[in-house]
């Protein structure tokens, strides 16, 4: 608990879609989702920056505004870049640099729905480590992924809360 996540999308429309869906999913669980774009100005922007710096905002969704100098994260642990091919090396490094004041570097997840040939991807993203894990560590139980219809959301939330109350991972 107390860690933060930043999700950066290349357009305000895509970022807003992510924001709206994440608010719908996470705010009922008590997770504060922040919306940060270049169009947010003045007192509203300062209030949002304060929530990010204090750690009150656990998930920050935005566009390039997420990597501006005045955005300071309290405990950034995960940076997600959607449509990663739309951002250059400099933007990815700026997002990672948000943790220079801490002893650890955030995990970086890059997503894209655009098929990029493997050779081009390996050339374009040569600054990144790529690993493939194709077996479980000894003694590890396989993860079971389940998909539920949206009309069962309350049931899923209740089950997650029960598991967390028992001290289990979810």
Name each model feature, range by range.
Residues 1-170:
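Inter-lobe coupling/hinge segments of SF2-like helicase ATPases
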